Amino acid sequence: MTLLALGINHKTAPVSLRERVVFSPDKLGVALDSLLQQPLVQGGVVLSTCNRTELYLSVDEQENQREQLIRWLCEYHQLRPEDVNGSLYWHQDNAAVSHLMRVASGLDSLVLGEPQILGQVKKAFAESQRGHSLSSELERLFQKSFTVAKRVRTETDIGASAVSVAFAACTLARQIFESLADVTVLLVGAGETIELVARYLREHNVQKMVIANRTRERAQALATEVGAEVITLAELDEQLVQADIVISSTASTLPIIGKGMMERTLKARRNQPMLMVDIAVPRDIEPEVGKLPNVYLYSVDDLHAIIQHNLAQRKAAAVQAESIVQQESSDFMAWLRAQSAVETIRDYRAQADELRAEMTAKALAAIQQGNDVEAVIQELTHRLTNRLIHAPTKSLQQAARDGDQNRLQILRDSLGLD
């Protein structure tokens, strides 16, 4: 048995190829069934995200295993091997173990240290569990990888610093306000960045969130998800008065929030401070707003400066995380190698126990026939000793005849003679 990881990701393939090898969630069970029908495959997990598609497998080692698995992948997705060969990577045993641990820990992600990948790995694992597609070795490997990811999160600062614009905006808000539970947040726009911001804020217990957008329909689905109120941009002036934090990201070509609007807002708020984060390009908030008293305005460039600093911190933390992965992958491989002896140990113990039972039965029968107990015990121990040392003795003699000093030393170690 050998462990394999086969796949493509954002480093090795463009999106035009990655999208052609995606396994859709609703057909993943069918894909796993097809994969396990391959004669060499004992167990499998399929991880498929926007940035990577990977197969984690336990297989019966064969000379042409790589060709067989690539052929299956291509046939399933109606591709030719030459379409993917230049983009595929292949890891075996220790390299496969390390790769999964790095993936689960966010060390192989487009955004270094991002936490979402762990949930995606867990989801892929759960799908294989439901379909009974796991071998015992794969199950142990994935459980171990989850533990490693947790260690990396708790023992390093890999996830402590914001490295996306959305996350940086939320981190800034958390740094300025002691508690987000008591503030009102106004989100302007309803695109992907605002979606991420809204989810981050909800995770940090923001109770009052308002989403302002040109159309209510686009914002409503997000508002329902995060428990926010929806308004149109026409209502923005009125809502600004209530907002402690404003985060804006629209596709507008002109500023939406101007200096005059904010002067009226501050007057109505009696100059209570406001945090404003403009992550739109072109800008949604006139730069002059940042000169007003009690307004703390940050642009996307300000956030990028924060991100670059934090990315450097994450890279430093990644060195420590890689050390954890190296240690844990070595430990797992030691466990895996030990499993190859389990069946032999079980057979050896069963053989010894069978011999014990046989000799005990003969000794008891002899005693019941009136034979001297001491003589029976002496005979029992003599026969038991001879039977137990017979096979090792033959192996020692054969190793000596062959002049195999290495084997002789292994046998001496096994018998506890050194």
Curated annotation (Swiss-Prot):
Keywords: NADP, Oxidoreductase, Porphyrin biosynthesis. InterPro entries: 4pyrrol_synth_GluRdtase (IPR000343), 4pyrrol_synth_GluRdtase_dimer (IPR015896), 4pyrrol_synth_GluRdtase_N (IPR015895), GluRdtase_CS (IPR018214), GluRdtase_dimer_dom_sf (IPR036453), GluRdtase_N_sf (IPR036343), NAD(P)-bd_dom_sf (IPR036291), Shikm_DH/Glu-tRNA_Rdtase (IPR006151). GO terms for biological process: protoporphyrinogen IX biosynthetic process from glutamate. GO terms for molecular function: glutamyl-tRNA reductase activity; NADP binding. It is an enzyme of class 1 (oxidoreductase). It catalyses: (S)-4-amino-5-oxopentanoate + tRNA(Glu) + NADP(+) = L-glutamyl-tRNA(Glu) + NADPH + H(+). Its EC number is 1.2.1.70. NADP(+) binds at residues 189-194. The record marks 99 as: Important for activity. Transmembrane segments: none annotated. Substrate binds at residues 49-52, 109, 114-116, 120. The active site is at residue 50. Gene3D superfamilies: Glutamyl-tRNA reductase, N-terminal domain, NAD(P)-binding Rossmann-like Domain. Possesses an unusual extended V-shaped dimeric structure with each monomer consisting of three distinct domains arranged along a curved 'spinal' alpha-helix. The N-terminal catalytic domain specifically recognizes the glutamate moiety of the substrate. The second domain is the NADPH-binding domain, and the third C-terminal domain is responsible for dimerization. Homodimer. During catalysis, the active site Cys acts as a nucleophile attacking the alpha-carbonyl group of tRNA-bound glutamate with the formation of a thioester intermediate between enzyme and glutamate, and the concomitant release of tRNA(Glu). The thioester intermediate is finally reduced by direct hydride transfer from NADPH, to form the product GSA. This is Glutamyl-tRNA reductase. The lineage of its organism: Bacteria, Pseudomonadati, Pseudomonadota, Gammaproteobacteria, Enterobacterales. The gene is hemA.
